[in-house]
Amino acid sequence: MTTSTDRLSVTVAENKQPYFVEWADSFGPKIAGVKIIFWSFFFGAIGLFYRAIKSLNSRERMLSTLAFTLFLTSIIFSRYSGNSTFNGTNGLSLLFYALGPIVLLATLGYYYRLHYKSGEQERLKNIEFSSIFVLCFFLISLISARGGIRLVMMLVPAASILAAYLSVEIASLALNTEKSTKRTISIICAGIIIVAFIFSGYQFYKTSVATAAGYIPSPYNQQWQKAMAWVRESTPPNAVFGHWWDYGYWVQTLGERATVLDGGNAKSYWNHLMGRYALTGTSNKEALEFLYAHNTTHFLIDSTDIGKYSAFSSIGSDKNYDRVSFFATFNQDLSQIQERKNSTVFLYSGGVLLDADIIYEDNGTRIFLPEGTAALGALLIEKSSTTGEMISQPVGIFVNQDRQYNLPLRYAFDGELKDFGSGIESGVFFIPRLINGANGLQIQDDGSLLYLSSRAVNSQFARLYFYNEVNPNFELVHSEDDFFVAEIKKQVPSFNSSIISYDALRGPIKIWEIHYPSDIEFKKEYLSEEWPPELLRV
């Protein structure tokens, strides 16, 4: 089963429908491979159900509890993992998922009818309402957690109640048991569970402390705080910011300025328009017309948008996914440097499937590399041995059906955009890389590069953020360096790049002030809030 099937939802990580092996880890820790909290609330729910129906006879209680156990198991384990028999989408998984509630409802319905026909339905009124309420709360929370990662937190209160109930019930059983053997066993079980809970709490504490420490400093309390301080102090109070939706609340709260998009996705179709025209489009005019319709005064791009390009290019595509693309990272392989008479050839290794077909004529031979099947495996960059500048076009090493094709790329950016006038409509963008050398961390100039396919190489995003295009309509008014990049610049004054590759791509927050041409037209269609049906579904 899938819960999020529209373009926007499937690109939001929190909306992903989790597998059991993913969300169950939130209810650890493990002792000898056993998830303590998970199994505590699992058996706690079964125990509470058994207690709730104590007005029934032994046989009825036992069979009803078994039906409830099957019901609980079907909800949890019918979506176990992506590579298991129960992956949540195949026929067997769906059958098992449906079997649980069917068996439970059939069992309870059968006993209700039995008591009704015998005139004993009054016994059913003795079922504990409070227990049923807790179980309903738990089941709603459990189904919600199964439906989306962001809803796993809803399971925490109910799971905590049931885990605590299990320990209290076992402790109560130990205290009220007269037989010494049962009493001893119950006390031992209760002790083990209580100690396990204490251990779990301590492990959660350690994990939380370590996680919190890893987030300090973070982009939110360093780079974004500083960038938004500039926004508050240097832009008018009625300024309106355009950017990808992820940062809407940050700009609104930290920068105290209005935004076109926000984290709540109240008008999600505008995400499509922002992605299509302002970020992935190649027309400066269309980008301005969209932003003008929303009274946008400033435009913002954050370095994390580099990794999100695949998301907003998907959301911004037409029904044929004409904009879908990504920025693939390739790293320089120091073991495969080729020295020539007056130049050096560097190999950048990586690997990515093509996002669009490539058709290229080479000496009268037509080369066809299909999207999704052919791949780019590496890139060759030739530089002068004396000046260090590129002296020839980048060459992509493409592979299709066990055949290799070395094809030239038309564009390259190494301080400035170079258009070689021929080659496939793709390019590379060089980035310094921080590596662990013999003497500690070392900066490797042009140690990494991004491959920009034909769909992305001339996009608004690439031209503004990567190439620093001088655009009369988009004036760069502020650039806030990543915390790590800022520290490098302090220690290495000669370092002049705003982007570096270290664990991830670290770059600036760039803000442009928009200057609209006098003849720009207002287009009402950019204010539409309704998704065309053909664009909504994946």
Label for each model-derived stretch:
Residues T2-Y116, E128-V134:
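Alpha-helical transmembrane segments at the extracellular/periplasmic loop-to-helix junctions
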Residues L124, V134-L139, T280-T282:
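Short linear interaction motifs
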Residues F68-S81, L139-R146, V195-G201:
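Aromatic-anchored segments of alpha-helical transmembrane domains
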Residues G47-K54, I140-G148:
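Hydrophobic alpha-helical transmembrane segments
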Residues F49-S58, T107-R123, S160-I188:
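Membrane-interface junctions at the ends of membrane-embedded or membrane-associated helices
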Residues N90-V103, S144-E178, T184-I187:
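Hydrophobic/aromatic-rich transmembrane helices and adjacent perimembrane loops
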Residues T177-V538:
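Extracytoplasmic
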